[in-house]
């Protein structure tokens, strides 16, 4: 079988890649990429998994769909490619990071350094049509990303799940909260950030949890240039 992900996720998800729902998703995507503008590009579909192997995941930050504007999405939730304006939700994440840990916001939105330290930046749907939010919902991605959450839940080493907003928090029912750590608040979107995202201190909470678990905390300070 063709290797889809080039690390430990391949073995963990290989059974899923053989299932009818995933085959259907593949056919759907093949057509979409041929006839529409789809984000992210095909080579970045599984960036979140490529950058954060299964055994290295310490924290999961769950997003929903990729950004649907040009040059934004590159396979990591909330992150945008270098040289692209920081989107409103991410600007609010930076505000909270500053309030929580004192880190000055950087002028880019490229979160790869978090991913490389064990922060799985996972969207529940991994593709979208240009300019059409939610256009690839219900096509099979949710089934695959639910399995990713289930596999992490089954893992012996605990994970810190950061769940912003109602859709992300619906996943709590799949997580054994006696073993794993849940940090939740409203979504950082400008529509909801003032309802409790601001002041929620997710970054220091995540690091405190990691230290309790005997893990190295995340350096949430992003590099100034990328």
Curated annotation (Swiss-Prot):
For this entry, list what GO says about its biological process.
base-excision repair, AP site formation via deaminated base removal
GO MF terms listed in the record are: uracil DNA N-glycosylase activity
List the InterPro entries hit by this protein, alphabetically: UDG_fam1, Ura-DNA_Glyclase_AS, Uracil-DNA_glycosylase-like, Uracil-DNA_glycosylase-like_sf
List residues traversing the bilayer: none
Specify where it is mainly localized: cytoplasm
Q: Which SMART domains match?
A: UDG, UreE_C
Report which superkingdom the organism of origin falls in. Bacteria
Name the EC number(s).
3.2.2.27
Could you give one GO CC term from the UniProt record? cytoplasm
Keywords (alphabetical) are:
Cytoplasm, DNA damage, DNA repair, Hydrolase
Gene3D superfamilies given in the database record: Uracil-DNA glycosylase-like domain
Its recorded reaction(s) are:
Hydrolyzes single-stranded DNA or mismatched double-stranded DNA and polynucleotides, releasing free uracil
The protein's job, in short, is: Excises uracil residues from the DNA which can arise as a result of misincorporation of dUMP residues by DNA polymerase or due to deamination of cytosine.
The UniProt entry's sequence similarity note says: Belongs to the uracil-DNA glycosylase (UDG) superfamily. UNG family.
**HAMAP family named among the record's database cross-references:** UDG
Protein's UniProt name:
Uracil-DNA glycosylase
- Gene it is expressed from: ung
């Amino acid at each position: 079988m063709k290797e889809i992900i080039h690390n430990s996720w391949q073995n963990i998800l290989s059974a899923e890649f053989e299932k009818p729902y995933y085959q259907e998703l593949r056919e759907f995507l093949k057509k979409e990429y041929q006839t529409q503008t789809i984000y992210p590009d095909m080579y970045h579909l599984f960036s979140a998994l490529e950058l954060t192997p299964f055994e290295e995941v310490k924290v999961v930050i769950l997003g929903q769909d990729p950004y649907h504007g040009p040059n934004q999405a590159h396979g990591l939730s909330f992150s945008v490619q270098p040289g692209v304006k920081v989107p409103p939700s991410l600007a609010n994440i930076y505000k909270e990071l500053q309030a929580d840990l004192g880190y000055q916001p950087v002028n880019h939105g490229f979160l790869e350094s978090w991913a490389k330290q064990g922060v799985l930046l996972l969207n529940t749907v991994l593709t979208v049509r240009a300019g059409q939010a939610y256009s690839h919902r219900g096509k099979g991605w949710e089934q695959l990303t639910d399995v990713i959450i289930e596999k992490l839940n089954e893992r012996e080493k605990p994970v810190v799940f950061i769940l912003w907003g109602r859709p992300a928090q619906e996943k709590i029912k799949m997580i054994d909260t006696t073993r794993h750590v849940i940090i939740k608040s409203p979504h950082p979107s400008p529509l909801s950030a003032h309802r409790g995202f601001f002041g929620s201190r997710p970054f220091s909470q995540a690091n405190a949890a990691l230290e309790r678990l005997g893990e190295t905390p995340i350096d949430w300070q992003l590099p100034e240039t990328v």
